Amino acid sequence: MDSVYLRMVAALPATEGHVSNTATGGASANTLTPQVRSALAKVPAPALAIIQTVDNDIQCDAANVKSVGASVADALAVIHDASPNTKILVVGQLGRPSVTFVKDLVAHDATKKQGLTWDDDCTFYDAQGMLHEAGFRKLTAAIDAYEAETARVCAAVPNCATDGGVRRAWVDKIDLFSPVDDGHLNKQGQAAEAEQIWPVVQRLVGA
């Protein structure tokens, strides 16, 4: 897979071996700073630091937006204070809730509907099993609120940039996801994800 790291090494050979991934699946934003400190202990002056968070912090009413932003701001400050020349990329949520994708997903496996039915206004299906399109709009608005806040705190840190909406434009496709876990990309999906974000990385690090 032509990952961001492998693309970085090809474009900037001096970065080879200088890599650390301390991300943890399902982690919340308040774990970012410990992850950052762990990564910096292994690579004290990285050319690039990528921050990807929010997903597991999302609340339908976005009530915790400010606390998520504060967690991200703290992590960014730790990076910049330790390594002022490091370029920091804060990436957004991959894609947005899609009626088309969810319909396709449930058409392939009707049991998926249960996992897309929640007890809040962001549910994709109502209690009667009918598609609830207002839930897609509500969740999209919540995600946008989190990303606006993380973009705001990023803008206050030198050398920090967002992906500028590139990841927002991602379109979910069933064949890009794991057949046993539709919440995670397969190798093909991960390669597509890296390809999509690479131009943003190139501009940021001058590769």
Language model: regions and residue ranges:
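Conserved SGNH/GDSL esterase-like catalytic core that processes O-acyl groups on lipids
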Residues: 1-71
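Alpha-helix N-cap and loop-to-helix initiation/capping positions
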Residues: 63-68, 138-142, 185
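Extracellular glycan-modifying ectodomains
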Residues: 56-58, 65, 70, 74-75, ...
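Active-site-proximal beta-strand/loop segments in catalytic clefts of secreted hydrolases
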Residues: 22-27, 51-56, 79, 91-95, ...
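Short, amphipathic alpha-helical "lid/cap" segments that border enzyme active or binding sites
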Residues: 33, 65, 69, 147, ...
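A structural motif corresponding to the C-terminal end of an alpha-helix
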Residues: 3-16, 75-89, 135, 139-163
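Histidine-centered active-site loop/cap adjacent to the catalytic His
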Residues: 177-207
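Substrate-gating cap/lid alpha-helix
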Residues: 99-161
